Amino acid sequence: MTSLNTNVEHRRTRTTISQIIHDMTPENKFYITVADGGSKRFRNKPNDQSRHSGQYQPRNLSGKTNISTQSQFTPRLYGKQYNYNQPNRLQTRSVRPNYYSGYRYNNRTGNQEFYPMQPFNNQSFNNQSRTHQSKTYQHNQQKRSFNGPRNNGPQNNVPRFFQREETN
């Protein structure tokens, strides 16, 4: 083991109590530096070097601002739980891939919030994440439905002899 580097001289360590007390007097005080074994996982700044560089955001994005409803009981589909847009010094992918890019009416790229449930009343439904991207994917009942004709008017999807006859 190398000797302790004191301000007075380089000498072999004599570990007697009187020697330690002598070294801790202010004129010959020595300084011991301990190697930093602090874990790099638990830093206060965002963890932008790991692969999973999402910073946890426990905010309640459901729009129901109820004090008793804590954010841990908020369902997962109302907003992002992690922020995947951290800068990444390693060249790994720091943005979660867009799982909903194949749908119709969705021409946006990047992270999507996605509301898979249809509301009972489409007119009074407003998207909760107005600030992020206003309407990502939603069946618009005013547009044509996905398969088949419009669902108002005559029954176009039944054979012709089942349709109502016009009264002359």
Curated annotation (Swiss-Prot):
Superkingdom, according to UniProt? Viruses
- According to the record, the segments passing through the membrane are none
Annotated coiled-coil positions are none
Ranges of compositional bias, category Polar residues: 52-74, 82-95, 130-158
Q: Give residue spans, biased composition: Low complexity.
A: 120-129
Annotated spans, Disordered? 37-74, 81-100, 117-168
What is the protein's name according to its record?
Uncharacterized protein R297
